[in-house]
Regions:
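N-terminal metal-binding scaffold of metallo-dependent hydrolase/deaminase domains
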Residues: 1-36, 372
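Active-site glycine- and acidic-residue-rich loops that bind
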Residues: 99-105, 174-176, 192-197, 246-262, ...
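Active-site loop-to-helix "anion-binding N-cap" substructures in soluble metabolic enzymes
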Residues: 62-71, 92-102, 220-236
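Active-site-adjacent C-terminal substructures of enzyme catalytic domains
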Residues: 181, 202-335, 341-348, 363-368
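Divalent metal-binding pocket/active-site signature
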Residues: 129, 136-230
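C-terminal cap of metal-dependent C-N hydrolases
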Residues: 6, 341, 351-374
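Divalent metal-dependent hydrolysis catalytic cores, especially in the metallo-beta-lactamase
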Residues: 61, 77-106, 122-135, 162-174, ...
Length: 374
């Protein structure tokens, strides 16, 4: 199969024109006027279309009425189908702070999806464990009674029983045993600072031990002050660490998003952090890790008004960022290659290059999705 006369983002995320040849689900060649046989299917992408890599969401709890912590294949299939329709071709189902039994069951359900992928859905490429090793003071929408101190032996059991599918684990490194956890867990997967009371110095100590990621930067952590830089300042200051950004316009002000993308560059990645209410009618109440949330004017809220995740998706966030003034190429890269890099899969997915999976999204002149190849 060939996509011909395509405007596409090349592996350096420059907009170029040419053909993309696909064979057996992988990109075989890219370039201008590629030779083709008569029997080859050719899709003409000439005009105002732009081909970009499939989106990669490494932090998503749920959507379409389903949640990772439902711990069933059916829930993950509902999520995968919804995500693919919105251009997400790879994702990490994300657990919350809940019981050990639920976390283990969720990991096993994700493993089943990886071993036996569904047709017509986004691909599960690992799991993100957000909790239970977080700070109660910064729990956000996480359930307090299930919060645990950092416990590497417990995490190792989760990791091994699930066949090593955990790609990201979050924690508050200032908690007792936190730095030891970071040092050991970082040998297995990406470790992220999250839901934390850490100050600048404590965050930097965690980075020195192996933290390379910050979960939903700005949210559930100490902010940037000119005399107390906090976790946000520590991330800005350290080139080893990347930051997730929820770009729905509610979690972070557009002006701050513009500044963050300028400061972080290739260390900024987009996540949805979406919940089961994503794609469902506003005003309905939904369970979120044992707590009830409702959606009002695009915001998902706990009864006390706390923002509880989002109801957005990476495609909408790209459109948001472009409207906020972030360059299109940078926004797409932050939703594709950079999240793939964060979980160590940038050699397989995340950009349009020979040898990578042929996960492609065709956007029209309004940045709406015209087609998804997966």
């Amino acid at each position: 199969m060939l996509l011909i006369h395509a405007n596409y983002l090349d592996e350096d995320f420059r907009l170029v024109q040419g053909d993309i040849e696909i064979e057996d689900g992988k990109i075989l060649r890219v370039g201008k006027d590629l030779p083709r046989k008569e029997e080859d299917l050719a899709v003409d992408c000439a005009g105002s279309y732009t081909v970009v890599p499939g989106f990669v969401d490494v932090h998503i709890h749920g959507c379409a009425g389903a949640d990772t912590c439902d711990a069933t294949r059916e829930a993950l299939e509902a999520m995968a189908a919804f995500l693919l329709a919105h251009g997400v071709t790879s994702f990490c189902p994300t657990t919350m702070t809940t019981s050990r039994e639920t976390i283990q069951a969720a990991l096993l359900a994700a493993k089943d999806m990886m071993d036996h992928p569904m047709e017509g859905g986004a691909r599960v490429v690992g799991v993100n464990m957000e909790g239970p090793f977080i700070a109660k003071e910064r729990k956000g929408a996480q359930k307090e009674e299930d919060i645990l101190p950092p416990d590497f032996p417990l995490f190792q059991r989760f990791y091994e029983k699930s066949g090593g599918i955990v790609r990201l684990v979050d924690l508050a490194p200032e908690q007792p045993g936190g730095l030891d956890f970071v040092e050991k867990a970082s040998q297995l997967c990406t470790v992220s600072i999250a839901h934390t009371t850490a100050d600048y110095d404590q965050a930097k100590a965690a980075f020195d031990k192996g933290v390379t990621h910050a979960t939903h930067l700005f949210n559930a952590m100490s902010g940037l002050h000119h005399r107390k830089p906090g976790v946000v300042g520590a991330v800005f200051d350290d080139s080893r660490v990347r930051g997730e950004l929820i770009c729905d316009g509610f979690h972070i002000h557009p002006a701050v998003l513009r500044a963050a993308f300028r400061l972080l560059g290739d260390r900024a990645l987009i996540v949805s952090d979406s919940m089961r209410a994503n794609g469902m009618p506003e005003g309905e109440a939904f369970d979120l890790g044992g707590q009830m949330v409702t959606v009002h004017h695009g915001k998902e809220l706990l009864p006390d008004g706390t923002i509880a995740g989002s109801v957005t998706n990476l495609h909408q966030e790209i459109k948001n960022l472009v409207s906020f003034g972030v360059p299109f190429e940078q926004a797409v890269k932050a939703a594709t290659l950079l999240p793939a890099r964060a979980i160590g899969l940038d050699g397989e997915i995340g950009s349009i290059a020979p040898g990578k999976r042929a996960d492609l999204v065709v956007l029209d002149e309004n940045l709406d999705i015209a087609a998804v190849y997966h």
